[in-house]
Regions:
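Bacterial Sec-dependent N-terminal signal peptides
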Residues: 1-25, 236-238
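Short glycine/proline- and aromatic-enriched beta-strand/turn motifs that initiate or cap beta-hairpins
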Residues: 20-72, 237
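Outer-membrane beta-barrel channels and translocator barrels
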Residues: 32, 84, 139-143, 191-195, ...
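Residues on the lipid-exposed face of transmembrane beta-strands in outer-membrane beta-barrel proteins
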Residues: 39-43, 73-81, 93-95, 128-136, ...
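Extracellular/periplasm-exposed beta-strand and loop segments of Gram-negative cell-envelope proteins
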Residues: 47-70, 98-126, 155-179, 209-229
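Mid-chain, structured segments of secreted extracytoplasmic proteins
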Residues: 66-106
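Short, structured loop/turn "capping" segments at alpha-beta junctions
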Residues: 142-146, 161
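Predominantly the C-terminal beta-signal and adjacent terminal strand-loop region
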Residues: 177-182, 187-238
Length: 238
């Protein structure tokens, strides 16, 4: 997996911490609080999970369609509710700016008779999101505590409102505005003198087909647009 090096690093850090001092030196009672808030910022890479069409007439024109990871950014507010010694419930409303690159392999017969076509297109979105997830925490070792997350995220793409009004503009790939994703992540908390800092790696997988089926080869060449996003996040909680 492309990002497996980061998971390996987290596991190595967790193993190293398990042999260290177990008495906290900073914020010893921080995780005993029932409720606390914070902020999360991070880097994203997003793409579409595509399914190539079975329509033979379209396949003769578009020989293949591929999506590639493209960079983005997200910022979220964190509300964290302690449910037990090793379990928290988190809500992280925020904004995510993402783009997805798509590549199209046109047949020579089509390109020799048409002049208006694109080999690559970028689809941009601005999501207002409400992720809800469980945080499963391991034992704390000194000022270090690894954890896992699992949950779901509902999002609304504000950029799609403008794009979907331009029904006749073939330069735009239109998307359904609502997306629902399930998420899974791994990270570790570091307890500093005044705040708790965390580094987190998360994957989000879309469950809804985002494609608006227009009468053009850019959307006819696929039968499914589902989102996939990798997130590297930095969290500060007080």
């Amino acid at each position: 997996m492309k990002h497996s090096w980061f998971i390996t690093l987290l596991l190595l850090l967790a193993a190293q911490a398990s042999f260290g001092q177990t008495r906290p030196s900073h914020l010893g009672s921080f995780d005993d609080r029932k409720l606390h808030i914070g902020i999360q910022v991070g880097y994203t890479q997003s793409k579409f999970d595509l399914h190539y069409t079975e329509n033979d007439s379209v396949r003769q024109t578009v020989l293949g369609t591929t999506s590639y990871y493209s960079p983005g950014f997200h910022i979220n507010v964190i509300g964290d509710l302690r449910l037990g010694d090793h379990l928290n419930l988190r809500m992280l409303p925020g904004i995510t700016l993402i783009s997805r690159d798509m590549a199209f392999d046109w047949s020579e017969a089509y390109t020799s008779t048409h002049w208006k076509y694109d080999f690559r297109r970028t689809v941009e979105s601005v999501y207002g999101e409400v992720p809800i997830e469980f945080k499963f925490r391991a034992n704390r070792y000194n000022d270090f505590r690894p954890y896992l997350t699992a949950g779901a995220s509902w999002g609304f793409d504000f950029a799609s409102l403008r794009k979907n009004k331009n029904n006749d503009d073939e330069s735009i790939i239109r998307l359904n505005p609502i997306d629902l994703r399930y998420t899974a992540g791994v990270g570790f908390d570091v307890f500093l003198s005044y705040v708790k800092f965390a580094i987190e790696l998360k994957m989000a997988f879309g469950m809804i087909d985002l494609r608006v089926a227009d009468d053009d080869y850019y959307t006819l060449s696929t039968t499914d647009f589902k989102s996939r996003t990798f997130m590297l996040s930095f969290t500060f909680e007080g």
